[in-house]
Amino acid sequence: MNENISKVVIYTDGACAGNPGPGGWGALLQFNDTSKEILGYELDTTNNRMEITAALEALRILKKSCNVEIYTDSKYLQQGITTWIHNWVKNNWCKSNNEAVKNADLWQKLYAELSKHTIIWKWVKGHANNSGNIAADKLAAQGRQTAIEILKCRV
């Protein structure tokens, strides 16, 4: 980590009603003594897409290069970005069995954000008394609920 640049702690989460189904994502960003909450939704998505989107949107909101710690309760996101992505890039976004990587569109966007920051990815057990994770979970649930309400209006 570079001691001369700002440190930001981010908690992310995704939620989906059905898989696929209406989903939401949320992130809590903490910098010094301030925090910012962001959330969003998609009407037809998966839980994994919402997990990736939460991290992507949290990184996109940062205006300058930062030292970042991202906490996620998604092993898919944490392992994907720290372990699997290197081979995906090398294999032109294909897995070792030559199948296309699922959610490659989002993984590619997230991968592009990596060069802008120094990032440490940490897995945290979901629903286990971690206040940042609980906050991100609530934000993702709000996003999911918004998607559900919009779909109700369309019926």
UniProtKB/Swiss-Prot annotation:
GO cellular component term, pick one: cytoplasm
Broad class of where this protein is predominantly found: cytoplasm
Key words, A-Z: Cytoplasm, Endonuclease, Hydrolase, Magnesium, Metal-binding, Nuclease
A single GO molecular function term of this UniProt record: RNA-DNA hybrid ribonuclease activity
An example Gene Ontology biological process: DNA replication, removal of RNA primer
Lineage: Bacteria, Pseudomonadati, Pseudomonadota, Alphaproteobacteria, Rickettsiales
Entry function: Endonuclease that specifically degrades the RNA of RNA-DNA hybrids.
Name of protein: Ribonuclease H
